[in-house]
């Protein structure tokens, strides 16, 4: 905390807003990492440089959010600028977790641009009045703000990343056919429907199934989307409880709530096709990509309308 206060004091002495400065620095780091991430795809190698840059940007965004929390006196997710910075933090954090367990260069190339676009939009597109810290209206002065909004934003980050991984699966599976028939949780892992489960005398008799990169990406996408879907479900429930406490209504069907519910239905359909129908590869990937656009409409598109309880009211 002393280090954060020292950085804050240094920036103020030099006439710089610490929140905006740290956001811009995070943008620069992610921008520098972008060409390296694409270069690594051609070289078929995973770059530690990209991981270091993304991790540094993630730390800067975390410090930035702490600064804004100190400035405003409330959890920093009350306007579009703060939520975009929080979203970028979530995107970079999940990317780092994924790369740690699955160091595949195509992941860096697929996920880095969405973080760059998010922080660039926040830093250079939004007007100054939406970047400024502001006090909360009485209805938002609740512990539900932290629980509901942070969970929803983390769900957006996970669903966006999972959907982008599905896009990679769709592109890569056009050159190879996924053979595994399972629900991506290790159940029913047979390549042919005619194969039966037989009792073996020893583990040595079992023939391991090797997974291609597209199969591993498909499984990774499924797990990431599942995590995001659970967060979205919890976020919608907590939002309904909060709305009932604040406005006396569980659900008002304003644009944000409507599109959030549509997003939930799309990803519920995605999980249903995988768990119940056994779909793998291209078909569920298409559903996830549809969900990607729905999430973007839910998060950014609603602000074009400028109406509803959840709109930041910038565009119109």
Swiss-Prot record:
The chain crosses the membrane at residues 19-39, 47-67, 77-97, 106-126, 151-171, 224-244, 258-275, 285-305. GO terms for molecular function: heme binding; heme transmembrane transporter activity. InterPro entries: Cyt_c_assembly, Cyt_c_biogenesis_CcmC, Cyt_c_biogenesis_CcsA, Cyt_c_biogenesis_CcsA/CcmC. Keywords: Cytochrome c-type biogenesis, Membrane, Thylakoid, Transmembrane, Transmembrane helix. It is found in: Cellular thylakoid membrane. The keyword Repeat does not apply. Its main location: membrane. GO terms for cellular component: plasma membrane-derived thylakoid membrane. GO terms for biological process: cytochrome complex assembly. Required during biogenesis of c-type cytochromes (cytochrome c6 and cytochrome f) at the step of heme attachment. Belongs to the CcmF/CycK/Ccl1/NrfE/CcsA family. May interact with ccs1. This is Cytochrome c biogenesis protein CcsA. The gene is ccsA.
